[in-house]
């Protein structure tokens, strides 16, 4: 059915048929609007492709400079491993292990016999999610999100903390069930989830992405495992993305973040609004970004984890903090 009036349609309703001139103007106006929309869509698609190529080129250049570009993944890997070349081939710092209250990585990890009989067992912290959960953009293990949080929790609780990361660069929220299988095998005491950006890349509807996140959180909380989820950051602060695409992605990311936060809380987890609490601090501060100008740098991850850490400690204590409490407590927690 056409949305442009026709002579027959007007006559059938008993209305006066518009003149040929009026109909022509309306038709041409409609065509003009459609042409304008098509042009805008093509512009956005072109910007997306251009920005992606630029980010990938910078990532490869940085990896070559650091000596972290490695051969492709082993053939036969899971479908989730078939990612963009520069993501698959970049070797990330490794930080899984047991951390003491003074921040030392115990290597090798202590055996049960090495732990005093009256000492509490190590807490197990598991990281799930996408490239932000595994610290894509960092240059040393000390900058990894999981390591920062493990050391912070160990210092705050005066206990050993075992950190395991099952996140995957390029993962979408639909990958969480696979990650959960690995996570549950670790018998975690607390889980951190950072995910959502790749759902935007693949145009997964925000409500669907949030629902999948809520399901993952519910799977954990039903087992008595506390969960802290950092919601999607504001893509509007990433200047490597040109306008008007950046504004479009900003609105999408904020909508996704709001739905994620609601889903996490309804599932019994703690949601930390990174778009509100952290993203503004990236504006005008290029040192917060990695050399691909897209992912956070070590400093950027440090700022984000400073906001997440108080939420972890509160969840372990069976308490909840507000966003204001998180900001106020973060520096003290990290310097403890």
Where are these regions (language model features)?
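A short helix->loop->beta-strand "cap" motif at the edges of active sites that frequently abuts
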Residues: 223-225
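Short hydrophobic segments within beta-strands
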Residues: 128-129, 230
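Generic structural signal for well-ordered alpha-helices
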Residues: 180, 213-217, 257
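Alpha/beta-hydrolase-fold catalytic nucleophile elbow
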Residues: 194, 230-231
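Residue-level recognition of beta-strand->loop/alpha-helix junctions
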Residues: 165-167, 231, 273-276
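Catalytic His-Asp segment of secreted/periplasmic serine-dependent ester chemistry enzymes
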Residues: 236-336
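Conserved SGNH/GDSL esterase-like catalytic core that processes O-acyl groups on lipids
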Residues: 124-126, 132-211
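N-terminal secretory targeting modules
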Residues: 1-124, 313-315, 321-336
């Amino acid at each position: 059915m056409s949305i442009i009036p026709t002579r027959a349609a007007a006559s059938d309703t008993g209305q006066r048929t518009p003149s040929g001139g009026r109909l022509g103007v309306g038709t041409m106006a409609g065509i003009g609007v459609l042409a304008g929309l098509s042009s805008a869509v093509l512009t956005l698609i072109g910007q997306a492709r251009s920005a992606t190529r630029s980010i990938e080129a910078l990532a490869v250049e940085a990896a070559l400079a650091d000596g972290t570009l490695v051969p492709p993944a082993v053939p036969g890997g899971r479908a989730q491993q078939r990612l963009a070349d520069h993501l698959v081939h970049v070797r990330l710092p490794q930080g899984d292990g047991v951390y003491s209250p003074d921040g030392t990585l115990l290597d090798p990890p202590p055996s049960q016999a090495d732990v005093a009989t009256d000492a509490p067992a190590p807490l197990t912290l598991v990281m799930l999610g996408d490239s932000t959960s595994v610290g894509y953009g960092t240059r040393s293990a000390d900058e990894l999100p999981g390591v920062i949080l493990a050391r912070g929790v160990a210092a705050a609780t005066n206990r050993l903390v075992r950190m395991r990361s099952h996140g995957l660069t390029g993962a979408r929220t639909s990958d969480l069930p696979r990650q959960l299988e690995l996570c549950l095998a670790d018998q975690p005491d607390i889980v951190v989830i950072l995910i959502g950006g790749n759902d935007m890349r693949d145009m997964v509807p925000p409500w669907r992405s949030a629902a999948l996140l809520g399901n993952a959180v519910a799977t954990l909380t039903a087992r008595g495992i506390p969960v802290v989820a950092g919601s999607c950051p504001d893509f509007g602060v990433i200047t490597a993305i040109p306008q008007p695409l950046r504004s479009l992605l900003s609105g999408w990311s904020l909508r996704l973040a709001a739905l994620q936060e609601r889903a996490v809380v309804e599932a019994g987890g703690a949601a930390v609004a990174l778009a509100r609490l952290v993203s503004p601090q990236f504006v005008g501060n290029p040192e917060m970004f990695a050399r691909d100008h897209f992912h956070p740098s070590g400093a950027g991850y440090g700022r984000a984890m400073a906001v997440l850490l108080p939420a972890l400690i509160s969840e372990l204590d069976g308490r909840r903090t507000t966003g204001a409490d998180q900001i106020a407590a973060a520096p003290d927690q990290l310097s403890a």
